[in-house]
């Protein structure tokens, strides 16, 4: 028989290891016992994938064995945290112990010989998700372990050896009988096609699962109501894995575990309808493709770490120039945070914007900006400030008191980016955007919009948008919703140009040769080593908005960041690219500043629920039904105001404002109303009752707001940009609460995106673009500027990387 024996401690000197080594030699004629160490398995973190190489090896060894022996010491009356962590890993996405025969033993210098630890271990192994088959009784407790072995590691007491033999031989019989019970029972499906439902983000997903007598033949999922992106990969890969292995023992996809399990559960329902116990298929081995762990090696001109907008832009630029590129993406699908955006990309385009009328109050917004005392403006921005004054004076002279077109220019974009980013933290440290970087952003944003159009992005040119906190209507919004338009166009272009995208492949370290960066070492989906030799590396891995501990570590702007704070970010945004940069001496800038998105879903942190309308149509009220802030203000201003009101607030809309929401459909609205996550009523009074407000208060607030819209001026909170009144039923209330949205700081870069070290000198062959880099947005980012940033500096990174290849 073949057994695996887990050394239940990371201690380099352990009597439990010595005990297992004794058993390995003593019983070699009876069984093959292989010792497994756990010293390289990280502490359990459900937000990280189960891809640690040592963990995967333990998993496969357990699956292939006839039984498992676990030797545990006793720490503070329980098992070591390292062993507990390994068992958590082995009961989360991996389940090799399910039904597996297990023998427990332990050695301790205490006379009781780990008895309390063994009791706890039995309870853990019996828990749902672990479900091991632990041999009852016959506990082997080796007390006074420091006296139990001779200098050759042999047990020195014959009675102890005799009892160990009794326990082990009983375990051999127990394992044989237990494994006979685990032999899969014969079954037959009732052939046919069965309709079930899986729960996706967009609601219930109809599924059709077809069976022959012995096989799952096909799985079809109707994804019409889902947003394109990571979910697409789930709906293809999970069914493919199930059919390949004829098993429900399929790993969930990182970043989409909820949707993955929904698909698996949906197929399990169909299996049951077809007359078979789904537990049989859950105990089957994983598909063969999930077991491939062969190391891989590649060579290219440029390797890009991160498959969001910045990374894909860099790769596409390299491919356009006839060079080759590889993109490494840690998640199962490309997209990063870009695919989760609202869609509009900021770029001053005066010729296009002149086709739109100015809105009430917009001219006043510019006048207020230009009234800033020059003593408050940093010297490098003064010339642009004065030039903007001249531009706007000419506009004023042209129209006077008459209604004009929507004014804009790269200078206005630049000054709004500058003023929008000027902030002072809790320690009195001030920050503002580096002029040379901001100038590149605002001068070249329109080129990025046009380049994306050439790549295949189609824009809705009938409307100009202002995202939340944008301060101005200059957003170019794609026809396709959210950030999907950018990611689909770029990934298809890269594929058409024979570029390579490796998903499920987090970068772990740089490949260093003769003191220079020569590529990247990554880990594949099954834990295999991926080595990429490259002439240049572009870091485009995003920020750290999904890493609460890192946010708390660097925070100097917010008085408190709670452990349970939500985020709008992809769960891939954990700051690993920043840490990777630091490993070669990269300098950091602006790390203490984090932007919150004020209008996030209070339960999930997402942006795509409720009615997400342009800020000129925002009507924000607190839980009492009163306005409390200028709805057109910057994101951190809105967030601070919301937090002062308790965090939770509501966006009020009517039927006309609803039509300006870019994130939804009537079907989705109806589902959310039914689920109680969006409120709808025929009168404002009824709406107030639904959300727990005094009807008279909400009605008075809305009446007052409507008067401000008519006048084009808000004397209460000085909102000066309006569009629609709230007057046509039905009326809506969308619950909102701030969530982490954008980490302002990151790696230091120059205008060519070279990563700078702590002495502001370039690190050879290393470039960075997107949220992983800092210095552009300073303390607060304008809505719509992130997309302008990633596509502008992503392209620059690709160009610079090519131009500086050896």
Swiss-Prot record:
Active-site residues annotated for this sequence: 635
Job of this protein: Component of the NADH:(hydroxy)cinnamate reductase Crd that catalyzes the reduction of the double bond in cinnamate, p-coumarate, caffeate, and ferulate under anaerobic conditions with NADH or methyl viologen as the electron donor. Is moderately active against acrylate and practically inactive against urocanate, fumarate, methacrylate and crotonate. CrdB is the catalytic subunit that binds substrates. Is likely involved in protecting V.ruber from (hydroxy)cinnamate poisoning.
Lineage summary: Bacteria, Pseudomonadati, Pseudomonadota, Gammaproteobacteria, Vibrionales
Binding sites annotated in the UniProt record for FAD: 310, 329, 337-338, 342-343, 576, 742, 771, 786-787
Ranges in coiled-coil conformation: none
The UniProt record lists the keyword Transport: no
Cofactor: record remark: Binds 1 FAD per subunit.
Organism: Vibrio ruber (strain DSM 16370 / JCM 11486 / BCRC 17186 / CECT 7878 / LMG 23124 / VR1)
EC number, as in UniProt: 1.3.1.-
Record protein name field: NADH:(hydroxy)cinnamate reductase subunit CrdB
Subunit structure, interactors included: NADH:(hydroxy)cinnamate reductase Crd is a heterodimer composed of CrdA and CrdB subunits, encoded by adjacent genes.
PTM: Is flavinylated on Ser-257 by ApbE, encoded in a neighboring gene. Covalent attachment of FMN is essential for catalytic activity.
Stated family: Belongs to the FAD-dependent oxidoreductase 2 family. FRD/SDH subfamily.
InterPro entries attached to this UniProt entry: FAD-dep_OxRdtase_2_FAD-bd, FAD-oxidoreductase_2, FAD/NAD-bd_sf, Flavocytochrome_c, Flavoprotein-like_sf, FMN-bd, FMN_Rdtase-like_dom, Succ_DH/fumarate_Rdtase_cat_sf
Catalytic reaction annotation: 3-phenylpropanoate + NAD(+) = (E)-cinnamate + NADH + H(+); 3-(3,4-dihydroxyphenyl)propanoate + NAD(+) = (E)-caffeate + NADH + H(+); phloretate + NAD(+) = (E)-4-coumarate + NADH + H(+); dihydroferulate + NAD(+) = (E)-ferulate + NADH + H(+)
Cofactor: FAD; FMN
């Amino acid at each position: 028989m073949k057994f695996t024996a887990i050394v239940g401690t990371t201690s380099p000197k352990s009597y439990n290891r010595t005990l297992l080594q004794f058993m390995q030699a003593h019983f070699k004629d009876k069984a093959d016992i292989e010792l497994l160490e756990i010293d390289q398995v990280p502490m359990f973190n459900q937000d990280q994938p189960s891809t640690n190489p040592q963990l995967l090896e333990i998993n496969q060894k357990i699956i292939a064995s006839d039984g498992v022996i676990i030797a545990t010491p006793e720490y503070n009356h329980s098992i070591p945290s390292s062993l507990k962590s390994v068992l958590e890993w082995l009961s989360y996405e991996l389940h090799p112990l399910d039904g597996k025969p297990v023998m427990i033993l332990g050695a301790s210098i205490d006379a009781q010989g780990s008895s309390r630890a063994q009791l706890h271990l039995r309870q853990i192994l019996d828990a749902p998700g672990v479900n091991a088959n632990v041999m009852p009784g016959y506990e082997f407790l080796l007390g006074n372990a420091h006296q139990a072995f001779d200098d050759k590691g042999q047990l020195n007491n014959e009675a102890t050896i005799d009892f160990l033999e009794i326990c082990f031989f009983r375990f051999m019989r127990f394992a044989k009988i237990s494994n006979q019970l685990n032999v899969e029972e014969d079954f037959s499906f009732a052939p046919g096609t069965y309709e079930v439902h899986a729960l996706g983000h967009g609601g219930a997903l109809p599924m059709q699962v077809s069976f022959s007598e012995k096989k799952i033949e096909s799985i079809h999922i109707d994804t019409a109501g889902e947003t394109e992106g990571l979910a697409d990969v789930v709906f293809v890969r999970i069914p493919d894995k199930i059919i390949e292995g004829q098993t429900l023992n399929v790993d969930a996809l990182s970043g989409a575990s909820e949707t993955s399990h929904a698909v698996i559960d949906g197929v399990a329902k169909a299996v049951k309808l077809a007359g078979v116990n789904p537990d049989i298929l859950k105990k089957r081995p994983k598909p063969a493709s999930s077991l491939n762990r062969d190391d891989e090696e590649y060579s290219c001109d440029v390797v890009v770490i991160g498959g969001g907008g910045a990374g894909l832009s860099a790769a596409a630029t390299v491919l356009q120039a006839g060079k080759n590129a590889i993109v490494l993406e840690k998640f199962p699908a490309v997209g990063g945070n870009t695919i989760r955006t609202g869609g509009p990309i900021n770029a001053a385009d005066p010729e296009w914007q002149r086709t739109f009328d100015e809105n009430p109050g917009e001219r006043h917004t510019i006048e207020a900006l230009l009234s800033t005392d020059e003593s408050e403006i940093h010297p490098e921005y003064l010339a642009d400030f004065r030039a903007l004054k001249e531009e706007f004076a000419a506009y004023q002279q042209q129209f006077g008191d008459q209604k004009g077109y929507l004014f804009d220019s790269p200078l206005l974009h630049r000054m709004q980016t500058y003023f929008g980013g000027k902030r002072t933290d809790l320690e009195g440290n001030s920050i503002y955007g580096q002029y040379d970087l901001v100038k590149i952003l605002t001068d070249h944003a329109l080129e990025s919009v046009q380049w994306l159009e050439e790549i295949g992005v189609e824009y809705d040119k009938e409307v100009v948008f202002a995202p939340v906190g944008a301060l101005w209507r200059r957003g170019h919004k794609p026809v396709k919703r959210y950030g999907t338009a950018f990611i689909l166009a770029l990934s298809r272009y890269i594929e058409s140009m024979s570029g390579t995208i490796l998903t499920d492949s987090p970068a772990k370290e740089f490949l260093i040769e003769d003191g220079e960066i020569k590529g990247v070492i990554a880990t594949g989906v099954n834990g295999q080593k991926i080595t990429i030799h490259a002439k240049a590396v572009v870091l485009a891995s995003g920020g750290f908005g999904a890493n609460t501990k890192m946010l708390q570590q660097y925070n100097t702007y917010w008085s408190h960041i709670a452990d349970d704070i939500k985020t709008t970010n992809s769960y891939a945004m954990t700051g690993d690219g920043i840490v990777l940069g630091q490993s070669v001496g990269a300098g950091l800038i602006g790390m203490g500043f984090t932007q919150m998105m004020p209008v996030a879903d209070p339960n999930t942190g997402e942006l795509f629920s409720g009615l997400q309308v342009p800020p000129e149509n925002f009507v924000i009220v607190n839980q009492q039904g009163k306005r409390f802030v200028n709805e057109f203000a910057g994101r951190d201003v809105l967030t601070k105001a919301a937090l002062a009101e308790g965090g939770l607030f509501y966006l009020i809309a009517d039927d006309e404002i609803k039509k300006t929401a870019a994130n939804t459909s009537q079907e989705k609205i109806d589902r959310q109303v039914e689920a109680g996550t969006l409120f709808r009523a025929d009168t404002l009074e009824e709406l107030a009752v639904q959300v727990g407000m005094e009807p008279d208060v909400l009605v008075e607030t809305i009446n007052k707001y409507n008067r401000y819209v008519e006048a084009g001026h808000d004397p209460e909170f000085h909102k000066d940009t309006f569009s629609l009144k709230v007057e046509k039923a039905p009326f809506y209330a969308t619950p909102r609460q701030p969530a982490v949205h954008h980490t302002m700081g990151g790696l230091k870069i120059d205008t060519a995106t070279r990563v700078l070290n702590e002495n502001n000198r370039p690190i050879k062959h290393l470039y960075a673009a997107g949220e992983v880099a800092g210095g552009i947005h300073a303390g607060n980012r304008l809505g719509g500027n992130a997309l302008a940033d990633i596509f502008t500096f992503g392209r620059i990174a690709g160009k610079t990387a090519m131009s500086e290849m050896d």
